[in-house]
Each structure stands twice: as structure tokens, then as C-alpha cells.
């Protein structure tokens, strides 16, 4: 055996160790590869499991969160279902207050739902939110339908029937008013408030318009024909205006009842409601004004009535902010211009009619012009109210004719009083003055064509007694018409005093010849200091008696031909003649009756006999 070097032995041992180590390392490397392969496979297998697990964790969280959310709104859903049951029924069945209360509750639940979920869109409960909103929408729509039904409980009607029977226009009872107020209160702070107010206005305007439509056809014409004079009160505008004012008053009350808690809104709603009604009324007024303008001669007096109606409407709108009122006032001004012309035209008409009288009536009575003119003046007086409102913008000079020969009976006090009532009294007094002036002028022109016309002076003129009698007869008729018509109240005490002044003037005309007769009996002193009458003076006394008797019998004969139908005038004239003639004759008779040896030879009448004759002359 050979010996081995120790170092070599170490190398051999180390080399063997390295071989073993290399083999081990190779085995470890193979094992690690297997482990790596196995780990990779395991990793591939666990990745979807982890994802699923993560998804399950998320799902578990969502389920738990949803369960928590459902638990949090479960009470709201239960509460909402109770109120939904109410809203699914009719208002008439469940009652208005419970119905409105249910809508409020649903609205509160919706608001609470938003707060609990801390989300503005409440997306996880979008279906529930949508359903609640739909419930509120449907509920409010049903309220509007019910409100409309309440409004329509009063349907259009013919207001003329109610006015004829003096029945008030239909109005809602307290229950309906209360229900409508509840609905309006509900919508007060709602976005649909304007919509419910518009519904209210629309339905009320519809009711009024369709009701007034029954009367509107009668406003299209003023009289039954183009040449037919207007009869007071016959225009359909009167009924239309009366009905419209009734409706307007009703609407004012209704708005106050429904908006009693919101007084500031009342004028606004009233104006919106009335505006279309007044607009249609304006069309009617304009149409009638044009008719007046086209046929003033026959229907002109209607302008006073129309003015009254327009004034009534304007008074009802006073203080209300309604733009149409200004247009209506402009129409009133135009109508009153037509009325102003009627005042002037009446005097032109009087002048034309009196000048058309060709001669005095054979009985010295009332001619056709007097009857016609007084009829026109009487008709004028029927429109007292309209005349008063029209004349306040006029002066007396606007109707007086430019004729210097006229002696007006108006007093200074009347001239200074510029009130409407006094101006109207002056107008009617002037018209009567002008009528009698025209009659007197024509009487003098026809009876005394060769003589100057005396109208302003107190000079005597031919046929003065007959003319006086003629004028007294006419004044008697005028007086009767005055007493039986509105002229009496229009004239008043000052105007009636003017008639009395005319009566005295014409009585003086009538007794003028009697006054001349009595002047015969005015004597100088015929009796001497011894109480005797000289033969020369006796002849003068005889002549005076004879002249008086002749004149007396002539006047008696003439006076007996006059027929007086007015008992009051008979009495006045008889008294005037007796008081004028009898005292003078009695004085003269008593003074000279004993101057003659045979008195009856020269003295035809004793005072009592004279009085008996005088009593027979006025028939």
C-alpha cells in the first residue's frame, strides 16, 4: 500500500464533498423548480377565489347596508301606505280636510326620506321617491278638479229672470265657500298657486260672460226702428248694466270670502277677474254711442240714460286698479258731448215749432206746437239724473239763443247759483220762457201784422186781452204737465216762481182792457162845497156812466166767447176782474147815484147787478 500524502488526502476528501454538495444542490434546484411550479399553479387557483371572496365581502356590505336602509325607512313606508289609501279614494268620500291632510303627510314623508338617506336624489329609493311624488301630483290634480267642480256648481243663467223676480243672483253656500278656501289655502305657497288662481278667474269669467250673453243681443239697437223715438228704459243696455253690476258685486264678495286672510291679494284678483267683463262692456257702450251719433234726432235722449249707466259702473270701479275704467271714462265724455248738444237743440226746436204756427186756434186754446214742445220737455225731464251729471260741465250761455228781444224771468239769485240742480232748473225755466215767448211773438205777428211787436215793453197793443187769454190757456196746460211730471221737482221753488211771474204777466194782458175800463171811473171832484153837482159836471158824470156801460158790455160780450177749462184759472181771472172793476164801480156809483132825479135812466147797473154779470163771463 502506497502511502498517501496528507494534503492530497484532504483534496480528495474535499473533492468528494464538493461532488456530494453539487449533487445535493442539483436536487435542491429541482425541488425548488417543482415548488415554484406548484406555487404558480396554486397562485393561479387562488386568484379567482380571492376575487370572489372580495366580491362576497362587498355584497355582504351592500346587503347589510341595504338592510339597514330598509330598516330605517320601513316606518315611513308603512305610514305612507296608510295615507296612500286615503288618496286613492274620492274627495267626496273621504272628505276634503282628510284628503288635504293626507297630501301634506305624504309630502312630509318625502322630505323625511330625503333627510334620512342623506341624499338629494335618494337613488337607492328612487322608485319610492317617484311613487310619493306621483301621489302628491295626483292628489293636487284631484284638488284642482274638485275645486273646479265646486266652482261649476253654479252654472250660467239668464239674469233677467232673477231681476224680474227680484231674486238675488246665485251664490255659494258656506260649506262650498269653506271648501274652496281650504283648497286655495293649500295652494297658497305652492308652485301651482298661479294655476289655481287662473282656474278660479277663468271659471268665474266664463259664468259671468255666458250669463250676460243672454242679455247682449238686446243691446244691439236702441229703438225698434230708425225713425222711432226712444222710449225711456227700453234699451237692453239698462238690463245688461244692472246685471253686470250685480255680478261685479257678487265677485267682490266672493273674493273677500275666499281670500279673507290675504287682503292684499284681493284687489289684484278682482282686477284680473273684472277686466275681461269690462272690456266686453266697453264694446257695447262704443256700439251704442255710435248709434246715438248716427240718429241723435230720434234717440238722442238715450244719451242721458247711457251716461247714468256708465256712471254707475264707474262708481262701482272707483278705487279699483282696473285699466278699462279709464277707457270707460273716455266713452262717458264722448256720450256727454252728445248730451250737451241736446240742450242747445231743444231751443232751436222750440223756435222752429212756434214759428210754424200760422194762426191762433179759433178757441184761443192750445196749438199743436205747445203740445209737441211740452211733450219733448217732459221727456227731457225723465232723464233728470243724466241731465244733472251732464249739465254740471255747462254754462247757461251754451243753450240760450242769441235773441236780445227775450225777457227771461230768471232771478239774480238763480244766475249766481252754479250748482247742477240750479242749472237744470234754469234750463227748464228758460225752455218754458222761450216757448211762451215764441207763442206770444207769433200771436202778435198773426193778429197785429201791421203793428210793431212788443215783447219787452209794457206798452199796450191791439188784441192784448185775446193774446193774454191765449197765453194763459197755454200756461195752464204747461202747469198741468209740470205738476204731473218730473219737471216740478226739477224746477223747484225758484223755477215755479218763474211760472208764477209769467202767469201774472199774462193776467195783466188779459185784464188790461178791464183796467182801461175802470180808468173811466177815475174822477176829479165834481161835488161843490154845498155837496151838489153842477149841471155841467152832471153831464160829465152821465157821460162817464154811459162810456163805462158801453165798454163794460163790449168786454162782457168778448169775455163770454172765451172758454176756460181750467177751474183754477177761471177762479183767478174772475177774482182779478172783480177786484179790479167792482170796487171802482161801487165807489163811483155810491158817490154819484143820487145826483140824478131818475138814476136808472143813466145808471144801468147797481154794484150787485154788476157783480152778477161779472160772475157769468168766466165760463
Swiss-Prot record:
GO terms for cellular component: cellular bud neck; exocyst. One of its GO terms (molecular function) is phosphatidylinositol-4,5-bisphosphate binding. Keywords: Exocytosis, Protein transport, Transport. It comes from the Eukaryota. It is found in: Bud; Bud neck. Gene3D superfamilies: 1.10.357.60, 1.20.1310.30, 1.20.58.1150, Exocyst complex component Exo70. SUPFAM superfamilies: Cullin repeat-like (SSF74788). One of its GO terms (biological process) is exocytosis. Its main location: other. Disulfide bonds: none annotated. It holds the Pfam family Exo70_N. InterPro entries: Cullin_repeat-like_dom_sf, Exo70, Exo70_C. Belongs to the EXO70 family. Involved in the secretory pathway as part of the exocyst complex which tethers secretory vesicles to the sites of exocytosis. Also plays a role in the assembly of the exocyst. PANTHER family: EXOCYST COMPLEX COMPONENT 7, EXOCYST COMPLEX PROTEIN EXO70. This is Exocyst complex protein EXO70. It comes from Kluyveromyces lactis (strain ATCC 8585 / CBS 2359 / DSM 70799 / NBRC 1267 / NRRL Y-1140 / WM37).
Amino acid at each position: 500500500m502506497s502511502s498517501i500524502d496528507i494534503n492530497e488526502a484532504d483534496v480528495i476528501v474535499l473533492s468528494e464533498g464538493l461532488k456530494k454538495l453539487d449533487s445535493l444542490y442539483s436536487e435542491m434546484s429541482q425541488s425548488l423548480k417543482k415548488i415554484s411550479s406548484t406555487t404558480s399553479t396554486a397562485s393561479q387557483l387562488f386568484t379567482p377565489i380571492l376575487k370572489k371572496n372580495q366580491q362576497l365581502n362587498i355584497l355582504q356590505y351592500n346587503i347589510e347596508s341595504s338592510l339597514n336602509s330598509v330598516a330605517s325607512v320601513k316606518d315611513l313606508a308603512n305610514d305612507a301606505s296608510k295615507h296612500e289609501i286615503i288618496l286613492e279614494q274620492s274627495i267626496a268620500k273621504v272628505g276634503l280636510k282628510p284628503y288635504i291632510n293626507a297630501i301634506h303627510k305624504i309630502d312630509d314623508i318625502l322630505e323625511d326620506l330625503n333627510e334620512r338617506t342623506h341624499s338629494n336624489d335618494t337613488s337607492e329609493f328612487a322608485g319610492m321617491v317617484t311613487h310619493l311624488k306621483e301621489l302628491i301630483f295626483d292628489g293636487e290634480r284631484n284638488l284642482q278638479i274638485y275645486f273646479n267642480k265646486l266652482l261649476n256648481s253654479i252654472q250660467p243663467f239668464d239674469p233677467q229672470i232673477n231681476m224680474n223676480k227680484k231674486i238675488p243672483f246665485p251664490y255659494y253656500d258656506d260649506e262650498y265657500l269653506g271648501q274652496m278656501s281650504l283648497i286655495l289655502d293649500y295652494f297658497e305657497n305652492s308652485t301651482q298657486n298661479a294655476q289655481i288662481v287662473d282656474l278660479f278667474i277663468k271659471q268665474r269669467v266664463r259664468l259671468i260672460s255666458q250669463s250676460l250673453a243672454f242679455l247682449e243681443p238686446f243691446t244691439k239697437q236702441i229703438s225698434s226702428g230708425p225713425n222711432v223715438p226712444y222710449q225711456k228704459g227700453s234699451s237692453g243696455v239698462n238690463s245688461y248694466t244692472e246685471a253686470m253690476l250685480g255680478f261685479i258685486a257678487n265677485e267682490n264678495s266672493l273674493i273677500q270670502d275666499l281670500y279673507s286672510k290675504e287682503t292684499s291679494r284681493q284687489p289684484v284678483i278682482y282686477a284680473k277677474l273684472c277686466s275681461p267683463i269690462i272690456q266686453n262692456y266697453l264694446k257695447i257702450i262704443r256700439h251704442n254711442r255710435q248709434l246715438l251719433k248716427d240718429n241723435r234726432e230720434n234717440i238722442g235722449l238715450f244719451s242721458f240714460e247711457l251716461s247714468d249707466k256708465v256712471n254707475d259702473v264707474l262708481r262701482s270701479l272707483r278705487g279699483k286698479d282696473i285699466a278699462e275704467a279709464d277707457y270707460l271714462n273716455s266713452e262717458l265724455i264722448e256720450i256727454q258731448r252728445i248730451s250737451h248738444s241736446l240742450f242747445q237743440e231743444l231751443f232751436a226746436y222750440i223756435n222752429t215749432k212756434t214759428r210754424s204756427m200760422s194762426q191762433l186756434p179759433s178757441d184761443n186754446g192750445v196749438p199743436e206746437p205747445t203740445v209737441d214742445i211740452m211733450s219733448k220737455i217732459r221727456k227731457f225731464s225723465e232723464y233728470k239724473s243724466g241731465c244733472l251729471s251732464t249739465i254740471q260741465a255747462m254754462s247757461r250761455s251754451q243753450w240760450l239763443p242769441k235773441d236780445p228781444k227775450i225777457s227771461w224771468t230768471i232771478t239774480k239769485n238763480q244766475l249766481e247759483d252754479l250748482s247742477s240742480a240750479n242749472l237744470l232748473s234754469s234750463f227748464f225755466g228758460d225752455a218754458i220762457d222761450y216757448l211762451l215767448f215764441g207763442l206770444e211773438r207769433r200771436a202778435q205777428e198773426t193778429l197785429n201784422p201791421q203793428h210793431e211787436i212788443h215783447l219787452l215793453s209794457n206798452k199796450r197793443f191791439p188784441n192784448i186781452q185775446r193774446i193774454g187769454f191765449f197765453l194763459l190757456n197755454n200756461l195752464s196746460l204747461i202747469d198741468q204737465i209740470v205738476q204731473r211730471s218730473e219737471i216740478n221737482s226739477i224746477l223747484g221753488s225758484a223755477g215755479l216762481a218763474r211760472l208764477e211771474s209769467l202767469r201774472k204777466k199774462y193776467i195783466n194782458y188779459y185784464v188790461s182792457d178791464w183796467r182801461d175800463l175802470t180808468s173811466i171811473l177815475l174822477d176829479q171832484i165834481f161835488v161843490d162845497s154845498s155837496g151838489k153837482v153842477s149841471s155841467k159836471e152832471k153831464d160829465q158824470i152821465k157821460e162817464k156812466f154811459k162810456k163805462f156801460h158801453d165798454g163794460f158790455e163790449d168786454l162782457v160780450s168778448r169775455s163770454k166767447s172765451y172758454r176756460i177749462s181750467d177751474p183754477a184759472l177761471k177762479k183767478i181771472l174772475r177774482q182779478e176782474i172783480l177786484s179790479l172793476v167792482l170796487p171802482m164801480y161801487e165807489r163811483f156809483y155810491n158817490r154819484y147815484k143820487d145826483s140824478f132825479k131818475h138814476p136808472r135812466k143813466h145808471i144801468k147797473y147797481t154794484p150787485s147787478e154788476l157783480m152778477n154779470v161779472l160772475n157769468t163771463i168766466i165760463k
